Regions:
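Outer-membrane beta-barrel proteins
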Residues: 1-315
Length: 315
């Protein structure tokens, strides 16, 4: 009997050791959306579920992310009840070189969305005298880029060289004001763009101002807190935009208001988008977020009001 107990204890210990470096996290959100477009009202309920599994062995990490969303967010209705494998990548070190390879989507900037997930990606990076150097490749898109980043006299700088364009990102604190700049210089004619954001807190209220300027052939598609999802705003080539955002905490709630004004390149196509959001953690472990968005376009037949109520949980 003692021998059996000893064997069971050893087996349990070995099993625990085998899975000690594996973690599972996830989140789910459910959204109720009411849309009023020129008097035509629609209601919908959608959900999004994500599950991430991370395994570690020494300096090597494997990340696998799965999702199951409803059909309203997918092109393929069959995915409504199918778990879809999304990000899968491995990170490790070989000497002084950090290696990341696999499938993932990039990071959005104020100018461009990089949410398309591609496979066969790889990044080789290392540090050299305070400067981070990264060589990145995308097998699916047949593209490579080189990025240099570091700190220059208190200014965080990143310069990215792509096959058909160069990108520059700067951020610094100037007299208590957070300043960021993003610029794209493209080989194609009339395809440059630049944006900046100024942000400062006044008596518990964070105030930010953002401005983006695009050449006649560049379409802003960024997705950041400054403007929200520019693609959802349906900005066209050559459209410029500015935004003011206010954010504060009030009675346990996070409250924000964002006012976006789009100066369209086409005549009589300007529009404003005003968004108000209240977020509150609930006792049951969920977070409730209510967002009201009012879009006022040139011409009374182009206006739209959207009320979105989201219930989300992370685990």
């Amino acid at each position: 009997m003692k021998k059996q107990l000893l064997i069971a204890a050893v087996a349990a210990t070995m099993g625990t050791a085998a899975i000690a470096d594996v973690s599972i996290t996830g989140n789910m959100k459910v959204n109720y959306t009411n849309t009023d477009a020129n008097g035509a009202t629609t209601d919908s309920v959608s959900h999004e579920t994500n599950l991430a599994i991370v395994g570690k062995s020494g300096d090597t990490t494997v990340h696998m992310e799965m999702a199951m969303d409803d059909a309203s967010d997918r092109f393929d209705n069959a995915e409504q009840t199918t778990v879809v494998l999304e990000d899968v990548h491995l990170t490790t070190t070989i000497g002084a070189v950090k290696v990341k390879t696999g499938t993932w989507n990039g990071s959005d900037t104020i100018l461009a969305k990089d949410s398309d997930r591609t496979s066969g990606n790889w990044i080789l990076s290392t540090d050299m005298q305070g400067v981070s150097i990264a060589l990145e490749g995308d097998t699916q898109a047949s593209a490579t880029s080189t990025t240099f980043s570091g700190d220059i006299a208190g200014v965080a700088a990143k310069y990215k060289m792509k096959s058909t364009s160069d990108e520059l990102y700067l951020s610094a604190d100037v007299a208590g004001v957070a300043v960021t700049y993003a610029g794209i210089s493209a080989d194609a004619a009339n395809s440059d763009a630049a944006a900046f954001t100024l942000s400062k807190e006044f008596n518990g209220v964070t105030v930010s101002y953002s401005d983006v300027d695009a050449d006649s052939s560049y379409t802003v598609t960024g997705d950041t807190a400054a403007f929200g999802d520019a693609a959802a705003l349906a900005m066209a080539a050559g459209d410029d935009a500015s935004a003011i955002k206010l954010s504060t905490s009030m009675a346990g709630n996070t409250v924000s208001a964002r006012f976006v004004s789009v100066d369209a390149a086409a005549a009589n196509s300007d529009f404003d988008v005003n968004t108000f959001t209240v977020t509150r953690p609930l006792a049951g472990g969920t977070t409730l977020e209510v967002t009201y968005t009012d879009t006022d376009k040139t011409g009374s037949t182009n206006d739209k009001e959207v009320l979105d109520v989201e219930l989300a949980v992370k685990f």
